[in-house]
Design a protein with these regions (language model features):
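Donor-sugar nucleotide-binding helix/loop cap in glycosyltransferases
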Residues: 1-259
């Protein structure tokens, strides 16, 4: 799911449920499969291998002698939110994977996503060209579950609007940025970049943030998580995607972590 190709059965809810079961106690593979897919349901297809593999790739579980155990502190899977923060903290480890590459390419398209094809299924071919490897419609269906869950934006029917507010909020916490402290914007980018290269341009000479990241930062500003500012005598100037309707129309120099 993350190391290579995306698969639709490995949805976040299944991965979380599997982790919660083994958080209670280690299970044999057969026991775990029965709890996840009880025989009385008479399912003709088993998806167990797909979501178990996703959990293993993420380092959430480990298997030894056909016994599956939790591989992280139980707090990492205490809730769907805590599992999301765990995954976001480790996402850069999968930079060669299909999920990472597709997410990176989609955000790099900037606001062009508003004017092109609206169905993720139809975007499989252009995204395949963008990342230089095959992407099919089923893999795009798998992508939508995780890209929404990890906080990169909002899904409306089969159109995905990039707004990385939840992801960025997680990354602010993961990076250990101090509440109440004002940072130059360059300092802020340096702090979050080890966890956010998937959507943040890692060339500091550009000093420009794409549409989805800009949407996320403005949302965090609006709800009081951060305060964006352009202080006139500051030279560390970064550009958001222009939006005249917002108090932060384009340029920023400082950011304060509010909560």
């Amino acid at each position: 799911m993350f190391q290579d190709k995306m698969v639709t059965p490995a949805i976040p809810e299944r991965v979380f449920t599997l982790c919660r079961i083994v958080a209670e106690k280690a299970n044999t593979e057969a026991e775990l499969r029965e709890k996840m897919e009880p025989a009385y349901l008479s399912q003709t297809t088993s998806y167990f291998a797909d979501y178990r593999t996703a959990a293993e790739e993420l380092g959430l579980i480990s298997t030894a002698d056909r016994v599956v155990s939790l591989a992280v502190d139980p707090s990492a899977v205490a809730s769907m939110d805590s599992m999301r923060r765990y995954v976001n903290a480790h996402l850069e480890e999968f930079s060669a994977g299909q999920f990472y590459r597709v997410t990176q390419a989609y955000f790099a398209w900037d606001a062009q996503v508003l004017h092109g094809k609206k169905s993720l299924v139809e975007l499989a071919e252009p995204l395949a060209k963008a990342i230089g490897r095959p992407v099919d419609p089923m893999e795009m269906r798998a992508w939508r579950f995780w890209v929404s869950y990890l906080g990169f934006g909002c899904l409306h029917e089969m159109f995905f609007l990039p707004n990385a507010d939840v992801f960025l909020h997680d990354v602010i916490r993961i990076a250990g940025l101090e509440t109440g402290r004002a940072y130059s914007f360059g300092e802020f980018i340096d702090a979050i970049l080890p966890y956010s290269r998937v959507i943040v341009d890692d060339d500091p000479a550009q000093r420009r943030l794409n549409y989805g990241v800009s949407n996320g930062l403005r949302t965090l500003h609006d709800i009081g998580v951060v305060r964006l500012e352009h202080i006139l005598d500051q030279e560390d100037i970064w550009s958001l995607y222009p939006l005249k309707a917002h108090p932060i129309t384009e340029t920023v120099t400082n950011i304060t972590i509010c909560g």
